[in-house]
């Protein structure tokens, strides 16, 4: 016989926490409220952060399990309802949603690849690529790519050291 593989349960996660309180708007948008349309408007949408969640809920409409809701301008996933079907991942035009292990504790809640000063100007909780998280991680599970922290969940020991050192609080607990 063939031995069955054990599959890690996955869940969708939105890599952005730039809600209405943490990022500003460059202009008032009054067009079609569909995230797929925003890349065609000036600066890719009204939010100062060009990498952040647009907050118009295209992912909400795509989810057949009612697992995503817009909270204060940013999509949030209900881990209990999410079945990791990937429909939200496929439809997000900013590629902010990914499937991560359901038991992943620390996650980078930012997708900005802008340099630190640009990110700081756009969002109060954006990753600035400072590498303090990399230096703090005892398991060598964190790296910085394109001015952005990335956690290898297979190496992560969930100690919280990266999260504690992050000056922008871009690394959070996945609740």
Task: Kindly label every feature range from the protein language model.
Residues 75, 148-149:
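Hydrophobic residues embedded in beta-strands of well-ordered beta-sheets
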Residues 160:
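Terminal recognition/anchoring or ligand-binding modules at protein termini
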């Amino acid at each position: 016989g063939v031995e069955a593989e054990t599959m890690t349960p996955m869940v969708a996660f939105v890599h952005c926490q730039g809600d209405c309180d943490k990022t500003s708007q460059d202009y008032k948008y009054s067009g079609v409220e569909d995230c797929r349309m925003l890349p065609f408007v000036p600066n890719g949408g009204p939010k100062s952060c060009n990498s952040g969640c647009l907050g118009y809920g295209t992912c909400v409409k795509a989810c057949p399990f009612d697992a995503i809701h817009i909270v204060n301008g940013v999509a949030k996933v209900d881990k209990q309802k999410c079945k990791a079907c990937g429909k939200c991942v496929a439809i997000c035009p900013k590629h902010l949603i990914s499937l991560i292990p359901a038991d992943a504790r620390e996650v980078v809640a930012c997708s900005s690849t802008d340099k630190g000063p640009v990110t700081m100007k756009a969002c109060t909780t954006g990753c600035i690529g400072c590498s303090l998280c990399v230096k703090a991680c005892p398991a060598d599970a964190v790296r910085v790519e394109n001015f952005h922290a990335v956690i290898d969940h297979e190496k992560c020991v969930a100690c919280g050291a990266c999260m504690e050192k992050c000056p922008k609080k871009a690394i959070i607990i996945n609740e």
